[in-house]
């Protein structure tokens, strides 16, 4: 299941803002870039609710897997975790999150991937 529209990041200005103004958290399998939300950037995308809600994007390089099926499977796993855990915990946090997966073969190890993802969420203080 994909992220709801009000939780998605989109547009090159948004990603440029995150790359310039983010705090980076590194793990073995992925890196997090967390930045304070800036709703003015989203106004150019005609968002009716350009609020300070938590938003996220997951970027998976072809270096992780050449097959789009595997990359989409990983993306769906992480998005499902976000959908089930973030609204319950704190959807009011005004942060934007960009998740970049590092090079490696971990398509078959869902538990290791989710454990690393959850550890970085705690480390970045997006969840408590």
Swiss-Prot record:
It catalyses: Endonucleolytic cleavage of RNA, removing 5'-extranucleotides from tRNA precursor. GO terms for molecular function: 3'-tRNA processing endoribonuclease activity; ribonuclease P activity; tRNA binding. It holds the Pfam family Ribonuclease_P. The keyword Cytoplasm does not apply. One of its GO terms (cellular component) is ribonuclease P complex. Its EC number is 3.1.26.5. Gene3D superfamilies: 3.30.230.10. GO terms for biological process: tRNA 5'-leader removal. Keywords: Endonuclease, Hydrolase, Nuclease, RNA-binding, tRNA processing. It is an enzyme of class 3 (hydrolase). RNaseP catalyzes the removal of the 5'-leader sequence from pre-tRNA to produce the mature 5'-terminus. It can also cleave other RNA substrates such as 4.5S RNA. The protein component plays an auxiliary but essential role in vivo by binding to the 5'-leader sequence and broadening the substrate specificity of the ribozyme. Belongs to the RnpA family. HAMAP family: RNase_P. Consists of a catalytic RNA component (M1 or rnpB) and a protein subunit. This is Ribonuclease P protein component. It comes from Prochlorococcus marinus (strain MIT 9312). The lineage of its organism: Bacteria, Bacillati, Cyanobacteriota, Cyanophyceae, Synechococcales. The gene is rnpA.
């Amino acid at each position: 299941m994909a992220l709801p529209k009000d939780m998605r990041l989109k547009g090159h200005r948004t990603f440029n803002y995150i790359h310039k103004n983010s705090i980076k958290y590194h793990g073995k399998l992925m890196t997090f870039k967390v930045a304070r939300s800036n709703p003015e950037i989203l106004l150019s995308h005609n968002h009716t609710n350009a609020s300070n809600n938590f938003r996220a994007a997951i970027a998976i390089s072809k270096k992780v897997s050449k097959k789009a099926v595997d990359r989409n499977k990983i993306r769906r796993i992480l998005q499902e975790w976000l959908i089930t855990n973030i609204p319950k915990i704190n959807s009011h946090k005004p942060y934007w999150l960009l998740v970049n997966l590092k090079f490696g073969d971990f398509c078959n190890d869902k538990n290791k991937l989710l454990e690393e993802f959850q550890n970085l969420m705690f480390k970045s203080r997006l969840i408590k």
